[in-house]
Protein backbone atom coordinates (compact mmCIF):
# COMPACT_ATOMS: atom_id res chain seq x y z
CA UNK A 1 0.00 0.00 0.00
CA UNK A 2 2.78 2.43 0.87
CA UNK A 3 4.74 1.51 -2.26
CA UNK A 4 1.64 2.19 -4.37
CA UNK A 5 1.09 5.60 -2.73
CA UNK A 6 -2.25 4.56 -1.27
CA UNK A 7 -1.29 5.56 2.27
CA UNK A 8 -1.35 8.99 3.87
CA UNK A 9 -0.90 10.26 7.41
CA UNK A 10 -4.05 11.39 9.19
CA UNK A 11 -2.46 14.07 11.34
CA UNK A 12 -5.58 14.57 13.49
CA UNK A 13 -5.53 10.92 14.56
CA UNK A 14 -1.78 10.45 14.31
CA UNK A 15 -2.14 7.31 12.19
CA UNK A 16 -1.77 6.05 8.66
CA UNK A 17 -4.88 5.80 6.51
CA UNK A 18 -5.53 4.83 2.90
CA UNK A 19 -7.06 6.48 -0.12
CA UNK A 20 -10.18 4.34 -0.58
CA UNK A 21 -10.77 5.14 -4.26
CA UNK A 22 -7.18 4.39 -5.27
CA UNK A 23 -7.16 1.18 -3.21
CA UNK A 24 -10.45 0.06 -4.77
CA UNK A 25 -9.11 0.47 -8.30
CA UNK A 26 -5.90 -1.40 -7.44
CA UNK A 27 -7.71 -4.22 -5.61
CA UNK A 28 -10.29 -4.78 -8.35
CA UNK A 29 -7.52 -4.97 -10.94
CA UNK A 30 -5.57 -7.47 -8.82
CA UNK A 31 -8.65 -9.62 -8.12
CA UNK A 32 -9.11 -10.31 -11.83
CA UNK A 33 -5.86 -12.29 -11.80
CA UNK A 34 -7.06 -14.90 -9.27
CA UNK A 35 -9.95 -17.33 -8.91
CA UNK A 36 -10.07 -17.58 -5.12
CA UNK A 37 -8.92 -14.84 -2.78
CA UNK A 38 -9.12 -14.22 0.95
CA UNK A 39 -9.08 -10.57 1.91
CA UNK A 40 -8.61 -9.49 5.50
CA UNK A 41 -9.38 -6.18 7.12
CA UNK A 42 -12.19 -3.91 8.12
CA UNK A 43 -12.12 -2.00 4.83
CA UNK A 44 -13.68 -4.78 2.72
CA UNK A 45 -17.15 -3.15 2.67
CA UNK A 46 -15.63 -0.02 1.20
CA UNK A 47 -13.33 -1.68 -1.35
CA UNK A 48 -15.40 -4.54 -2.78
CA UNK A 49 -18.75 -4.99 -4.50
CA UNK A 50 -21.18 -7.82 -3.60
CA UNK A 51 -20.50 -9.75 -6.82
CA UNK A 52 -16.83 -10.08 -5.79
CA UNK A 53 -17.69 -11.67 -2.45
CA UNK A 54 -18.87 -15.17 -1.57
CA UNK A 55 -18.59 -14.83 2.20
CA UNK A 56 -17.63 -12.18 4.75
CA UNK A 57 -16.32 -13.16 8.17
CA UNK A 58 -16.53 -10.33 10.70
CA UNK A 59 -14.21 -10.93 13.64
CA UNK A 60 -15.21 -9.09 16.81
CA UNK A 61 -13.25 -8.57 20.04
CA UNK A 62 -14.21 -7.25 23.43
CA UNK A 63 -13.60 -3.48 23.62
CA UNK A 64 -11.98 -4.05 27.02
CA UNK A 65 -9.21 -6.11 25.41
CA UNK A 66 -9.02 -3.86 22.36
CA UNK A 67 -8.37 -0.93 24.68
CA UNK A 68 -5.45 -2.79 26.21
CA UNK A 69 -4.05 -3.66 22.76
CA UNK A 70 -4.40 -0.11 21.46
CA UNK A 71 -2.62 1.30 24.51
CA UNK A 72 0.25 -1.16 23.97
CA UNK A 73 0.47 0.05 20.36
CA UNK A 74 0.63 3.66 21.58
CA UNK A 75 -2.44 4.75 19.60
CA UNK A 76 -3.55 8.31 20.20
CA UNK A 77 -6.59 8.76 22.45
CA UNK A 78 -8.55 9.97 19.42
CA UNK A 79 -7.71 6.81 17.45
CA UNK A 80 -8.49 4.60 20.46
CA UNK A 81 -11.84 6.30 20.95
CA UNK A 82 -12.70 5.94 17.25
CA UNK A 83 -11.82 2.23 17.14
CA UNK A 84 -13.45 1.31 20.46
CA UNK A 85 -16.65 3.16 19.58
CA UNK A 86 -16.72 1.45 16.19
CA UNK A 87 -16.41 -1.98 17.82
CA UNK A 88 -19.05 -1.24 20.47
CA UNK A 89 -21.51 -0.09 17.82
CA UNK A 90 -20.62 -2.92 15.42
CA UNK A 91 -19.83 -0.58 12.54
CA UNK A 92 -17.91 -3.13 10.46
CA UNK A 93 -20.70 -5.69 10.88
CA UNK A 94 -23.34 -3.10 9.98
CA UNK A 95 -21.44 -1.89 6.92
CA UNK A 96 -20.82 -5.48 5.79
CA UNK A 97 -24.50 -6.41 6.12
CA UNK A 98 -25.53 -3.23 4.32
CA UNK A 99 -23.08 -3.85 1.47
CA UNK A 100 -23.15 -7.63 1.04
CA UNK A 101 -26.41 -8.80 2.66
CA UNK A 102 -26.99 -10.95 5.76
CA UNK A 103 -26.76 -14.21 3.82
CA UNK A 104 -23.06 -13.60 3.10
CA UNK A 105 -22.02 -12.71 6.67
CA UNK A 106 -20.63 -14.77 9.55
CA UNK A 107 -19.72 -13.07 12.83
CA UNK A 108 -17.37 -14.44 15.50
CA UNK A 109 -16.39 -13.18 18.95
CA UNK A 110 -12.64 -13.80 19.01
CA UNK A 111 -12.01 -12.38 22.48
CA UNK A 112 -11.11 -15.65 24.20
CA UNK A 113 -10.53 -17.78 21.11
CA UNK A 114 -7.26 -19.02 19.71
CA UNK A 115 -6.55 -18.86 15.98
CA UNK A 116 -7.07 -22.62 15.86
CA UNK A 117 -10.52 -22.32 17.47
CA UNK A 118 -11.55 -19.55 15.09
CA UNK A 119 -10.47 -21.60 12.07
CA UNK A 120 -12.38 -24.62 13.39
CA UNK A 121 -15.54 -22.52 13.87
CA UNK A 122 -15.13 -21.02 10.42
CA UNK A 123 -14.83 -24.44 8.77
CA UNK A 124 -17.92 -25.60 10.69
CA UNK A 125 -19.83 -22.53 9.50
CA UNK A 126 -18.72 -23.09 5.91
CA UNK A 127 -19.97 -26.68 6.02
CA UNK A 128 -23.15 -26.06 8.04
CA UNK A 129 -25.15 -22.90 7.36
CA UNK A 130 -27.00 -23.30 10.68
CA UNK A 131 -23.71 -22.39 12.40
CA UNK A 132 -23.62 -19.02 10.64
CA UNK A 133 -24.73 -16.39 13.12
CA UNK A 134 -24.81 -12.62 13.16
CA UNK A 135 -26.05 -10.07 15.63
CA UNK A 136 -25.40 -12.07 18.81
CA UNK A 137 -22.56 -9.87 20.05
CA UNK A 138 -23.67 -6.96 22.23
CA UNK A 139 -20.86 -4.90 23.71
CA UNK A 140 -23.24 -2.10 24.76
CA UNK A 141 -24.59 -4.22 27.60
CA UNK A 142 -21.07 -4.73 28.98
CA UNK A 143 -20.20 -1.02 29.21
CA UNK A 144 -21.71 -0.54 32.65
CA UNK A 145 -19.13 -3.00 34.02
CA UNK A 146 -16.17 -1.16 32.49
CA UNK A 147 -15.94 2.42 33.70
CA UNK A 148 -12.80 3.17 31.69
CA UNK A 149 -14.55 2.22 28.44
CA UNK A 150 -17.67 4.13 29.43
CA UNK A 151 -15.61 7.28 30.03
CA UNK A 152 -13.77 6.76 26.77
CA UNK A 153 -16.91 6.63 24.63
CA UNK A 154 -18.81 9.33 26.53
CA UNK A 155 -18.49 12.64 24.72
Residue ranges and their predicted role:
Residues 97-155:
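NTP-dependent small-molecule kinase module
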Residues 40, 58-59, 84, 109-110:
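Small/polar loops that bind or transfer phosphate-bearing groups
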